Amino acid sequence: MKSAEIRAKFLKFFESKGHQIVASSSLVPHEDPTLLFTNAGMNQFKDVFLGFDKRPYSRATTSQKCVRAGGKHNDLENVGYTARHHTFFEMLGNFSFGDYFKRDAITYAWELLTEVFKLPKDKLWVTVYAEDDEAYDIWTKEVGVPAERVIRIGDNKGARYASDNFWMMGDTGPCGPCTEIFYDHGPHIWGGPPGSPEEDGDRYIEIWNNVFMQFNRDEQGVMHPLPKPSVDTGMGLERISAVLQGVHANYEIDLFKSLISSAMRAVGTAEALVERARDSMTNTISPSYKVLADHIRACSFLIADGVIPGNEGRGYVLRRIIRRAIRHGYKLGARAAFFHKMVPDLVAEMGEAYPELKAGERRVADVLRQEEERFFATIENGMAIVEGELAAMATAGNTVFNGDTAFKLHDTYGFPLDLTADICREREVTVDAAAFDAAMARQKEQARAAGKFKMAANLDYDGPATTFHGYDKLEAKGNILALYKDGVAVNELVEGDLGVVVLDHTPFYAESGGQAGDRGELKGAAGIFGVEDTLKIQASVFGHHGVVKTGKLAVGQGVAARVDTAARAATARNHSVTHLMHKALREVLGPHVQQKGSLVDPDKTRFDFAHTAPMSAEEIREVEEIVNREILANAATEAAVMALDDAQKSGAMMLFGEKYGDEVRVLSIGSSKELCGGTHVARTGDIGLFKIVVEGGVAAGVRRVEAVTGENALRYTQEQERRVQGVSALLKVQPDEVAERVAGILDNVRALEKELARLKSKLAASQGEDLVAQAVDVGGAKLLAATLEGADVPTLRETMDKLKDKLKSAAIVLASVADGKVSLIAGVTADLTGKVKAGELVNFVAQQVGGKGGGRPDMAQAGGTEPDKLPAALAAVQAWVSAKL
């Protein structure tokens, strides 16, 4: 039964029991600042359980997207190395909001598992909270599970109610006992039942947890029965799929086999190995392929839900996951962007269940590709530093990676700390995290000391307000009312001082309404002050932030205040076009579009708005056309101050939740009319040209566009044109023929790759025939240790398979050398694996050539860095195998 069918059957079963099927919520928690990402099925129902929200249903069932990476729940470092850790997983759940309780929850679970999924009853074990006699009796007396397979778990975490079988939302609030269902994978796997000393083994695996919200815990820790108990359950789709598909590891289920094959194709693995991986168990596959199969899900779904790679918060977690994937692809041989190529395969597997993934396919691939290109520009140099440090450590016998080096990798080459730690883990060394943290703290302190002086609006000022003249003039005379240095009022500022100047009159616009503050110059009789930013100290008091360039300034002096006209004009273009763009977005996408935030400065406009789906290329073009038509119309801009009621009657657009005074400024520009206190162009034609350069998501239901105008728009368009012309010149075609020519080249490349694979296979077969004659008899079996010139690892593997078939009973070591590195494959036929293990054999050879490796008893792989020692290492194989036989 495939994963998609299991998901569908789960939802259909509970729908037949009166449950409302509810779509998965976004991975970005809605209005819950306590969560970095959605990590459980109940997250979207939290307010329902707390009584803050009412739904038209009392029973629900979901298949919820979840991510555990970053924050309290972080499985990132284990992904790829264990059977069941994931960054992304699907949680199947059924929920009762004051409707049914323990009896129905337990019987529903048992019916689904044993009658719908047909699991053997004797394979299922159950745990209950030690004091939950009700659940124990339902399991043993009503369901009929033998008492020896129903285990009571007490307070096993050092405090009252601190138990694996007692769930609490927090220190106070809803809580209650839970019952967990385990599947016994069989005695061939080590481990004991839950509660036993061997419970950490992998034989008994939890597949379903049913939480019974029965109590409300007060601040004194007293449990009060809830008037309407509820049920919250969760069953990992990956785990139940492994059980139903008869495999032990999650990475062996159909979904991951497909994605592992996709990863192999993306990094250029030979197609023969891809097919073998698809058709066999994946527990022998390199952890790196598992990392890629896992991470493509987390990254794609996060991007589809509006997260974009960045340097903080959710964006930085996403960047860490992407870069970890890139590093593992690099380890597998990828030297250019590859990860984004897996997106179509993921959409084929999961797009039907999650339409938002299918709708955002192009955007997801583009974001991944851009992030890959950025990191591939630095990864090679970064890896050289890593390898150099590891080599020095090996020489010195050191097992701790230098924290300052780790910080250099982070700061200069974009290596997140956990990526460096991941590499070190493979070499069995650790990173000095304390030294890394210290280096990070030093950099932050230096940045604070050297950075631009920018103060929050908390200066101690109790004087007259500033009169603003900047709507109609860019120069004005003013007197200095106050000066500040290091946040303290002073009488004067001298050359080199960073400070804040308060004037009685100014043409400088102070940052407000998303528009950046003006910059420019204050010129007095005794000195010149460079204004780098203008911020409001109080509602009507403007602070001019900057540095004294020459001479000095003193309180009471007069100055000539001059705004940087070019910067102001660019900002005005970007602000005015934001109004036109807002109107156009509502025309194209619908009236639900509302402003959620904006930033307007001389370089660009950034506009956040309410919308649930990525904009299509056609929608972006349509918005651009509408705005540029308004620009060409060259309509005059009009601003009027009026009563708030009059502004509302005029149809002026207002921001939801914004507080306005009794009088407001209404700006009419083209067909747009909004409340706005910013600075704008005189006519729409002054904007020149408008071009959207970025569209993406920033939160659940919030999209972001970035756009440029005027000269910046012209430069952007010319740069895009230059790139196309550059490609067309390389291809020797006209620009409008580039796409067709590239498609033809790709077809040729694919044909050549197939031909190369065919020739390598033919070469392997030919070499295999020649090598058979070189095998010698050892203890009644054949032994072969040989070098294949020019063979890559897939060719070594293919040759190994052919040799094992021909030699029947044999131990074989094949080697090749390329770029100063040794590749080794060891193979042992099934009849000899009881005495000779391929993993031990390949390690014996690898250790002599400066490497190590491992694998299955019948097939193993290794590498080395000392090819000059290879002949002696291969010559020693016969004695080693003879001793084993």
UniProtKB/Swiss-Prot annotation:
Q: Which chemical reaction does it catalyze?
A: tRNA(Ala) + L-alanine + ATP = L-alanyl-tRNA(Ala) + AMP + diphosphate
Q: Which Pfam families match?
A: DHHA1, tRNA-synt_2c, tRNA_SAD
Which SMART domains does this one have?
tRNA_SAD (SM00863)
One GO cellular component, as annotated: cytosol
Where in or outside the cell is it found? Cytoplasm
Q: Which residues bind Zn(2+)?
A: 575, 579, 676, 680
* Family under the similarity heading: Belongs to the class-II aminoacyl-tRNA synthetase family.
Q: What is this protein called?
A: Alanine--tRNA ligase
- Organism in which the protein naturally occurs: Azoarcus sp. (strain BH72)
Q: Which gene encodes it?
A: alaS
